[in-house]
Amino acid sequence: MAVKIRLTRMGSKKKPFYRINVADSRSPRDGRFIETVGTYNPLVAENQVTLKEDRVLTWLANGAQPSDTVRNILSKEGVLKKFHDSKFSK
């Protein structure tokens, strides 16, 4: 089972709000997911992001692949740097 970390669209028309979910890559965008690990609100000036960093790092260590947009969000939040440092510090 290929697992991806990706965005699920919530909110109303013209006012999107996203949850950052861990899901099977074969499930639809807004369909079944395994776990919610954060939120992303692009409408706020500073693009409000909340993350459960420990859970994101756990999923990345277990082989979950982030989507392109989630990869950019994790990079801006510094999570990918922590993951890279923990992976190659051995």
Curated annotation (Swiss-Prot):
InterPro entries: Ribosomal_bS16, Ribosomal_bS16_dom_sf. Keywords: Ribonucleoprotein, Ribosomal protein. It comes from the Bacteria. This is Small ribosomal subunit protein bS16. HAMAP family: Ribosomal_bS16 (MF_00385). It comes from Streptococcus pneumoniae serotype 19F (strain G54). One of its GO terms (cellular component) is small ribosomal subunit. NCBIfam families: S16 (TIGR00002). The lineage of its organism: Bacteria, Bacillati, Bacillota, Bacilli, Lactobacillales. Gene3D superfamilies: 3.30.1320.10. Belongs to the bacterial ribosomal protein bS16 family.
